[in-house]
A protein has these predicted regions:
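Membrane-interfacial helix-loop-helix junctions in multi-pass membrane proteins
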Residues: 42-46, 123, 174-228
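Transmembrane alpha-helix boundary and packing residues in multipass membrane permease domains
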Residues: 32, 36-37, 114, 118, ...
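A short amphipathic helical element positioned immediately N-terminal to and/or at the very start
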Residues: 3-15, 203
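Short helix-loop-helix connector
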Residues: 85, 89, 120, 153-154, ...
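Hydrophobic alpha-helical transmembrane segments of multi-pass membrane transport proteins
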Residues: 30, 34, 49-119, 165
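Short cytosolic juxtamembrane segments of multi-pass membrane proteins
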Residues: 236-243
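Hydrophobic alpha-helical transmembrane segments of multi-pass membrane transport/permease proteins
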Residues: 13-41, 49-69, 106-109, 168-171, ...
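Alpha-helical transmembrane segments and their short interhelical loops
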Residues: 91, 95-168, 210, 214-222, ...
Length: 243
């Protein structure tokens, strides 16, 4: 019950900043329009709407990292967390309390992307539902990564690292903008060692109904999600002991 009340408080805090929320939900749609326009004039298989949309949904989750990191960093700087550390809330309660309101926003963003892509020529099938469900592990990873960053960094640092660096890394390492095989070498090895490209390939496979291929990419995402969530809980636990 305490965790649910904390989650409700976090929801209200997120809704107090509708501009950032609108930007996070709307920017992936702008990219869909822009890249679809490029595809219409200079056909590139990577930018075909059925291939592009699943990748854009994965890229859009980078904004969930920024949301969660900013929320935690603001709470730390306002000393709210220091007061909450004196309550019976555990470190796990804090992490789940922050995650619960952001996860529906992430799934809403994904659904909006797919619905927005339909008039652009996206193939409509039940696989869209599978793709939305299948992105949950990656959404949890992104949110947990934001919570970890927010527990270690200040608001200004979060804006630079999560808002610029991680957003660009997510784009480059997911293979949304270019085929990783064209670069190859160390860059491709690094990309394959991280969850971003696996999430993009998972989404493409689920959307295409290729569940065997999707199964090949789910494990790295689950492992990264569990590891980052555990790291975030550990950071909160350490801060609670300090205060």
């Amino acid at each position: 019950m305490r965790m649910i009340n904390f989650a409700k408080r976090c929801t209200k805090e997120i809704l107090r900043d509708p501009l950032n929320l609108a930007f996070g939900l709307g920017f992936p749609l702008v990219l869909l329009l822009l890249l679809s326009a490029i595809q219409a004039n200079i056909p590139v298989s990577l930018f075909e709407i059925d291939t592009l949309t699943p990748g854009i949904t994965v890229f859009g989750l980078a904004f969930m990292t920024l949301f969660s990191a900013t929320l935690v960093a603001k709470d730390r700087e306002s000393a709210l967390l220091q007061r909450l550390y004196t309550t019976p809330l555990t470190a796990f309660d804090f992490i789940i309390g922050y995650m619960l309101p952001i996860l529906p926003i992430a799934l809403g963003q994904v659904m909006i992307c797919y619905l927005f892509a339909i008039p652009l020529g996206l193939t409509v099938s039940v696989n869209i539902i599978y793709a939305v469900i299948g992105i949950i592990p990656m959404a949890i990873f992104n949110i947990a990564l934001g919570l970890l960053c927010g527990s270690l960094l200040g608001v200004k640092q979060v804006g630079g690292i999560c808002g610029a660096l991680l957003t660009n890394l997510s784009a480059w390492l997911s293979g949304v903008w270019f085929d990783l095989d064209l670069v190859g070498g160390v860059f491709k090895k690094i990309a394959n060692a991280l969850p971003f490209v696996h999430a993009a390939e998972l989404e493409k496979a689920l959307f295409g109904g290729n569940f065997a291929e999707a199964a090949e990419h789910i494990l790295p995402i689950l492992l990264y999600g569990a590891a980052i969530t555990a790291a975030a809980v550990f950071c909160f636990l350490r801060q609670m002991k300090k205060h």
